[in-house]
Regions:
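Short amphipathic alpha-helix adjacent to the substrate-entry channel of hydrolases
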Residues: 49-67
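Alpha/beta-hydrolase fold nucleophile elbow
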Residues: 101-112
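Short beta-strand element of the alpha/beta-hydrolase
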Residues: 34-43
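Alpha/beta-hydrolase active-site loop
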Residues: 81-100
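Mobile cap/lid helix-loop segments that gate and shape the active-site cleft of serine hydrolases
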Residues: 135, 140-175
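Short beta-strand/loop motif that positions the catalytic acidic residue
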Residues: 179, 185-187, 191
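N-terminal cap/lid segment of alpha/beta-hydrolase-fold proteins
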Residues: 1-30
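C-terminal catalytic histidine-bearing segment of alpha/beta-hydrolase fold enzymes
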Residues: 200, 209-248
Length: 248
């Protein structure tokens, strides 16, 4: 169903990643593109799929917002590999956008599953900041706390002890250093899907590495903030982007 907007053009685009046709939902402003926000979805398949309403939360009259579906999801070719080949779907999209809009600021937002997706890719890309929102920061911690997802993780990755190399390959912290783009950690204290331990662990590791970061915790909120808290979160995220661009 077409999405109508006075300020942006919505379209589902298809691009090549490892010779696979991968899809993304994009909203492009009718005015000059000065900022790009790449939204990395959570979930898998229909759960957590990219929706126009989510993209619109980050938009303004000069901001292009796009959310890749990842391979094997929502009409994209290939198989979802959960933090392996799908990482290329992110990096290829970022490079295409940077080539088309070389002067635009680029910010990545990784939500839930997308949190680790961004951590595994952002430091090697032409981005100005990374916002991890209710995001997974450690695959072992995810396996430990989400008993209900262990079967899926064993199918897609393996067992954390028997298939240690597969889990180590999905660890992002070793690749982050003091020169990495600025990171904002957003998390709810009552998040039952991705515990706030992920945020605490990431913040501690970034502190040890001397990496530039901020935290924004809403201790009374869950995985998705309630409407008043959502407004606060989005306001904080946009101001963080503004400050990063100001001090570029």
């Amino acid at each position: 169903m077409p999405i109508e907007s006075f300020t942006h053009q919505f379209e589902e685009i298809t691009y090549l990643s490892d010779d696979l046709q991968v899809k993304a939902l994009m909203m492009t402003p009718h005015h000059e593109v000065k900022r790009i926000v790449v939204y990395l979805r959570g979930g898998k398949g229909q759960v957590g799929r990219v929706r126009a309403g989510r993209l619109m939360q980050f938009s303004d009259s000069q901001t292009l917002v796009i959310g890749p579906y990842y391979r094997g999801n929502n009409g994209s070719e290939g198989k979802d590999e959960f933090y392996r080949g799908d990482l290329n779907d992110v990096t290829e999209l970022l490079r295409l956008l940077h080539d088309k809009y070389p002067q635009a600021f680029i910010h990545m937002v990784g939500f839930s599953r997308g949190g680790l997706q961004g951590l595994l890719t952002f430091q090697d890309l032409p981005v100005n900041s990374y916002i991890i929102w209710g995001g997974v920061s450690d695959i072992d911690l995810m396996y430990e706390e989400r008993v209900d997802l262990r079967g899926m993780l064993r199918r897609m990755i393996g067992h954390p002890k028997k298939d240690r190399a597969a889990y180590e390959a999905r660890q992002a912290i070793p690749n982050i250093n003091e020169n990495s783009p600025a990171i904002l950690i957003v998390h709810g204290g009552k998040d039952q899907q991705v515990g706030i331990r992920h945020a605490y662990y990431l913040a501690d590791q970034l502190e040890l590495k001397g990496a530039m970061h901020e935290t924004f915790y809403q201790m009374a909120e869950g995985h998705v903030p309630r409407p008043p808290a959502m407004v606060e979160t989005l306001t904080y995220i946009k101001e963080f982007m503004n400050q990063v661009e100001l001090h570029r």
